[in-house]
């Protein structure tokens, strides 16, 4: 899973930059708004529980979480968001899924299509690549911070599917229904998470060389920088020695 580690490390660095301009907070709040459309009680809404857990992992303040819930339930204005996925192919035929939360689908689909074309890819139809991914909980923990046994015990006993050695970090995969329980178990054990979110995890990775990896990364980066884009997923295995720029 070397490529996963490469993209995760890039995302973490981007995450620190995003946090400075509030983008991580915006993404977390949007996910809560959308999740809360299914009900504002986290105990009765598994997706809302997961969204709140992910928001806490990026330190979204409690008042912001509560405000997002009110928007999602319609108590406050500002909850007019539509969630959708756009699918397509990047350079080298890499499968790409783009998760968006938008108040104007026409604007967003045009922008996403333009970015695919600009960076050597193409948008596909619904279902064209989604079958290559599974929806899972994904939690990242700094590898050097805790003994392996502590991570394994806290994660697996709470129902995690797998704990993966991704170089500088442990990546924990869970079923959607077990995401909150695993996150809570790690927190109770005193383990600080770098990230905790629901994600589209590729079933298999496609290895690329450094040149092709750069092209795929530029597409993913451009999509990720769009204000309406929540997450970008691809079934790419980046080479370990690939420069980021």
Curated annotation (Swiss-Prot):
Keywords assigned by UniProt, alphabetized: Cytoplasm, DNA-binding, Transcription, Transcription regulation
Record keyword Thylakoid present: no
Gene Ontology biological process terms from the UniProt entry: regulation of DNA-templated transcription
InterPro entries reported in the protein's UniProt record: Integrase-like_N (IPR017856), TACO1_YebC-like_2nd/3rd_dom (IPR048300), TACO1_YebC_N (IPR049083), Transcrip_reg_TACO1-like (IPR002876), Transcrip_reg_TACO1-like_dom3 (IPR026564), YebC-like (IPR029072)
Region spans: Disordered: 1-21
Domain of life: Bacteria
Gene Ontology terms, MF aspect: DNA binding
A cellular-component GO term for this protein: cytosol
Compartmental location: Cytoplasm
A Pfam family assignment: TACO1_YebC_N
HAMAP family per record: Transcrip_reg_TACO1
UniProt cross-references to NCBIfam families, sorted A to Z: PRK00110.1, PRK12378.1, YebC/PmpR family DNA-binding transcriptional regulator
Family: Belongs to the TACO1 family.
Protein name as catalogued: Probable transcriptional regulatory protein Ddes_0536
């Amino acid at each position: 899973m070397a490529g996963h580690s490469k993209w995760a490390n890039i995302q973490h660095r981007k995450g620190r930059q995003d946090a400075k301009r509030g983008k991580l907070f915006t993404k977390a709040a949007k996910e809560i708004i959308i999740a809360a459309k299914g009900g504002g009680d986290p105990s009765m809404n598994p997706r809302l529980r997961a969204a709140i857990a992910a928001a806490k992992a990026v330190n979204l303040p409690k008042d912001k979480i509560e405000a997002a819930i009110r928007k999602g339930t319609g108590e406050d204005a500002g909850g007019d968001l539509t969630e959708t996925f756009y699918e397509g192919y990047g350079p080298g035929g890499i499968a790409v899924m783009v998760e968006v939360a938008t108040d104007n689908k026409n604007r967003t689909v045009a922008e996403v299509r333009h970015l695919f074309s600009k960076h050597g890819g193409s948008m596909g139809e619904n279902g064209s690549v989604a079958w290559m991914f599974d929806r899972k909980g994904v939690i990242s923990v700094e590898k050097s911070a805790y003994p392996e046994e502590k991570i394994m015990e806290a994660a697996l006993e709470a129902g995690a599917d797998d704990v993966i050695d991704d170089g500088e970090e442990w990546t924990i995969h869970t079923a959607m229904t077990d995401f909150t329980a695993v996150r809570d178990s790690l927190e109770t054990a005193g383990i600080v998470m770098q990230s905790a979110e629901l994600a589209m995890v590729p079933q298999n990775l496609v290895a690329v060389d450094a040149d092709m990896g750069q092209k795929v990364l530029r597409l993913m980066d451009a999509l990720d920088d769009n204000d309406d884009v929540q997450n970008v997923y691809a079934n790419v295995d980046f080479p370990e020695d690939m420069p980021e720029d």
